[in-house]
């Protein structure tokens, strides 16, 4: 009995040891259900695989994740997996996508994460229902072309060895998410702009140098291009209106600068909009595509709705919830209709007038006033209205268009080139009117007895019409040539008149300037009534001749004769200067050809010394000659004006010489070459601080200098540099009266004062350096 018990114990021990070691006893099936051991033997693996395949056949979801599979399970042939919609083969050791998985025609989701896949077979084209593909953390070097022919919506290919993306990637029209991060991609093909549905693009940790401009047309919501080598964000990216998240850290960005990028998306897009407004004329055609906006201002403050996905930038929630947000308002939509109705009413009114006047022809006198209205109408109306105007009756006398009136018409055409008179339209108008009048005057009742005579005289009538048209066209052409010649003569006479007026004014002013020491108040002398300005009624135009007179006075320097506005009284029509009445200019004006202005206008046109040009001339001469207005009695002579002008020119030459010396001093001391714009080069104070440290080391302890990421200093840092420079000059020993102000440097308005300060600073340099520097200069 004891021996039997020992044998049973030994057998039990052997059984347990065998199970623990993973072996199998003959006739004993070990598994999780047997309760002996954890169940990690080959039998348990095969049983779990079979169970997973059975579940996939029932549910359509195949889950074989984390099983260290090197190939697809052979037992899958015993199950019907054609209806599988989701397959998870992640965390295995597959070297390629299994061929068996490529026959699941109903597959929509395929996860091959973290395998050893180097190749994607062409049989994957069988998966025409596949919308999700995860092939991340594999060993792919390229994406095959046939992969781009699938109806994918999500493609995740991160953590591979991809060098580039195929150009056929543009065929993925339904792709909404593309993740190719952590690869070795150097360029993104321009065909990516064809991905019309792309919402999420992740190209993080690649070798990208620039971003394609075609991305600006995509409705991206999330964009991640961090950890690359990108230096510039294209200006056209301001059109990414749906963008909500942009990640761009760990890039050597220069545009926008780093200090703007760290502030976030809103500041980045504001910078891009500002740059677009600056360089809008110079942008390539791609950036200047029509966007539905009129200007940069409208892009910054747009109220255009973009649907549920809105980045919050470039959009304003105005509370307008109408469906017609992009439709024109009623005011603008009704405008063409109203214009069409008004035009139609005018045309109907003219036709009714024509019908009323047809019975009784009204012969007009062809006067200047009537023709002026007619020619204004031709100038300002469209071609359709010109044709309608032809229907209105005119006088039968063609000679009423005198050469004087045609000269006026031609003058209007020359002076208003924007709306020229069309001589062809006038000629057609004359021919049509002559034909209608001729037919109306020779019209007879159509009686049966006159039908034969009408047919017999048809040829004679047509011949007469032809001769009449030729004669009429010759007359109009000759009148037009006369008008052109008269217009040219008018222009020549006008130029000659202006020259004579200017000479007369200059002679008069010189004469008054020579008499100014003898008269105390030349403008207040009421006996002679002399004035250095001619009356405005003796000139052709209202402001041009006055401006010419002011320019003549500026040349002579008679600005002090201008009185104050409160003390100056406009001259009456009878107070014209006698000298000016007898001047040749006035005679030329009054004896000019017949197309001059009416005499009534010349007599009733008063003088307006308070006009804009008058005040502008007073202000210009006052600022040029003196710091404050002078009394009328202090009229300078021509010699004093010449001396002031010479003094100003000498002062300017001295300033230029000081600036040139300043440039030479700085370039010699610091061994640098300054740009042509010296003021802009010294604005930030960096060069001046280095110059102070060159004269005495460590006189400026800290200098703010620009960096590649921030190429331009802020105004606060520039001011700090300038103040440090001036403080260093003060400590070195530059006298206070020779120190310039910070504004002289910051605003580039006092380079001569800066030159004086630098000269005083260099005089305090060590003797050897000073002597060597002076000898070099």
UniProtKB/Swiss-Prot annotation:
* Record key words, sorted: Cytoplasm, Leucine-rich repeat, Phosphoprotein, Repeat
List each copy of the Calponin-homology (CH) domain by range.
Answer: 652-765
Composition skew (Low complexity), residue ranges: 635-645
List Phosphoserine occurrences by residue: 324, 415, 419, 611, 628
| Positions of region (Mediates direct interaction with MYO6) | 382-648
- LRR repeat coordinates: 56-79, 81-104, 105-127, 128-150, 152-172, 173-195, 196-218, 220-239, 240-264, 266-290
Q: Name one GO cellular component term.
A: cytosol
Which residues does UniProt assign to the signal peptide? none
Give the matching InterPro entries: CH_dom, CH_dom_sf, Leu-rich_rpt, Leu-rich_rpt_typical-subtyp, LRR_dom_sf, LRR_domain-containing
What are the boundaries of the region Mediates interaction with DOCK7? 56-290
The record ties this protein, via PROSITE patterns, to: CH
**KW Repeat (keyword) present:** yes
Among SUPFAM superfamilies, the record links this protein to:
Calponin-homology domain, CH-domain, L domain-like
Its localization reads: Cytoplasm
* Annotated region described as Disordered, given as residue ranges: 568-590, 621-653
* One GO term of the biological process aspect: septin cytoskeleton organization
Q: What does this protein do?
A: As part of the DISP complex, may regulate the association of septins with actin and thereby regulate the actin cytoskeleton.
On assembly, the entry states:
Component of the DOCK7-induced septin displacement/DISP complex, at least composed of DOCK7, LRCH3 and MYO6.
Protein name (database record): DISP complex protein LRCH3
Source organism of the structure: Homo sapiens (Human)
